[in-house]
Design a protein with these regions (language model features):
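Ligand/substrate-recognition segments at binding pockets and active sites
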Residues: 91, 239-309
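Gly/Pro-rich hinge or "lid" segments in bacterial periplasmic/extracellular proteins
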Residues: 51-107, 112
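Aromatic- and charge-enriched surface segment that lines or borders ligand/interaction sites
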Residues: 1-13, 36, 177
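A bilobed periplasmic-binding-protein/Venus flytrap-type ligand-binding module shared by bacterial periplasmic
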Residues: 97-101, 161-185, 189, 198, ...
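Detector for C-terminal structural segments
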Residues: 190-218, 261-270, 292-410
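Extracellular/periplasmic solute-recognition and catalytic clefts
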Residues: 8, 26-28, 83-95, 114-174, ...
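Surface-exposed binding/hinge segments that line
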Residues: 16-62
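Structural transition elements
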Residues: 206-241, 257-264
Length: 410
């Protein structure tokens, strides 16, 4: 285990999960069956972090200590073995077979699951209709989910599951255009309900905090501060700060990472801002391979991002955005958040005791607007008749739980 965790820290991959392990000061072993983690500061959420893939146990022989493993093969201690099928340097199918050496607590209800990867949601939906696959999830478009809800297809069931994914706008807070008053004015104008309803239908709902409503500690911090969308109030914010209008900048989004509705969402945001007369915003989409490095480099004044939590705790919706080594590489700093409230919240073993700290953190975000929450999503799984365990097949943090799937009548 020491090797597995230490290598994640040492490799420090730019897009990796090292942030979850940033509080580790030292790792030592005691005998053959004990690992001791020394933390820099107290952290009641650390056991949750050890339960994520960031701390997954991998064999030394296949996983070098200072470098990522090459290729697509994966070895570990989980409930399945994995065999990828590769075409033109890209994985197109993965076969998961029950691991005879697995010693964990999960009850695996199937012997094998095959996963096909599709270029888009249309191709995936077509494969389900043609009975080439038995189940689809994650990248299902709002249109597909709505169609299945309104006009159910024979032989296909649609299951709604709790979702903890969020969508938000991020800002380079050092950019001279998107100053705090400008960000506050955007928060005052944007109509989240219209965006969620018009673009995503039943698959999303408005979000007024970084912490979604289904997580303990949530408050409607943005609604409490700004209320209903108001161009008049936004104009007062800008006028008081001496900001010349219309404010001009480009709002960036990734065209291929979060699903087909992203472009429509950002067109709706653009229309709302520009219709106020206070903004003249253009939008631009980039492929994720270009988008993410440019966003982290600070090339974008304003941009859209999504977040799938690593574990269902308010810490995972605040620290990754507000800590020094934050996920966005944002220049925004709040000393109160970073030095006082986040450490205070992590000291509370009883997570309900951290509610006051999280309320203050959400209020800081609503006031400074380093990020601007837009919506929180629901999860849907479409499956063909005869597949059981679908309601448990995807966790609240959007992780596949393939071991729950089975065919009782097969």
């Amino acid at each position: 285990m020491k090797h597995s965790v230490q290598r994640v820290i040492d490799i420090d991959a730019e897009s990796g999960p090292v942030g979850l392990l940033a509080n580790i000061d030292m790792i030592e072993t005691k005998g053959e069956d004990q690992v001791i983690f020394h933390l820099k500061t107290p952290d009641a959420t650390f056991p949750y972090k050890l339960a994520t893939p960031a701390a997954g146990i991998v064999p030394k022989a296949q996983y070098p200590a200072k470098a990522a493993r090459k290729g697509f093969q994966v070895d570990g201690s989980g409930p399945y073995t994995m065999k990828p099928e590769v075409e033109d340097g890209r994985v197109v199918r993965i076969a998961f077979e029950k691991n005879p050496s697995y010693k964990g607590e999960l009850k695996v209800l199937n012997d094998k699951v095959e996963m096909d990867l599709f270029p888009d949601t249309g191709a995936m939906g077509k494969a389900l209709d043609e009975k080439k696959i038995h189940l689809m999830t994650r990248a299902m478009s709002p249109e597909q989910a709505h169609e299945m809800l309104v006009s159910p297809k024979e032989g296909v069931d649609l299951t709604e599951l709790p979702g903890l994914a969020i969508s938000y706008l991020g800002f380079n807070t050092k950019d001279p255009v998107v100053t705090k008053p400008v960000r506050q004015a955007m928060a005052q104008i944007i109509d989240r309900g219209q965006i969620a309803g018009k673009v995503y239908g039943t698959t999303a709902e408005p979000l007024y905090s970084l912490i979604p409503s289904s997580i303990a500690g949530h408050t409607n911090a943005f609604f409490n501060k700004y209320g209903e969308p108001s161009t008049a109030k936004a104009a007062k914010i800008l006028d008081k700060a001496g900001v010349e209008t219309p404010v001009k900048f480009t709002l960036h989004y990734t065209s291929d990472h979060y699903g087909p509705a992203t472009a429509e969402e950002f067109k709706a945001i653009q229309q709302q801002l520009n219709a106020s007369g206070l903004f003249k915003v253009s939008v631009r989409g980039e492929e994720w391979s270009t988008y993410r490095p440019e966003q982290k480099r600070g090339d974008y004044a304003a941009y859209g991002m999504g977040w799938f939590p690593d574990f269902p705790d308010p810490d995972n919706y605040t620290a990754p955005f507000l800590d020094a080594n934050n996920f966005l590489n944002s220049p925004y700093r709040s000393r109160e958040a970073e030095k006082v409230l986040i450490p205070q919240s992590r000291r509370a073993a009883d997570r309900t005791a951290a509610a006051d700290a999280y309320e203050k953190l959400q209020d800081i975000v609503a006031d400074d607007v380093p990020v601007l929450p837009i919506w929180q999503g629901k999860q849907y799984v479409a499956s063909r008749d005869g597949i059981a365990g679908v309601e448990r097949s995807v966790s609240a943090t959007s992780e596949l739980q393939l071991w729950e799937l089975n065919r009782p009548n097969a």
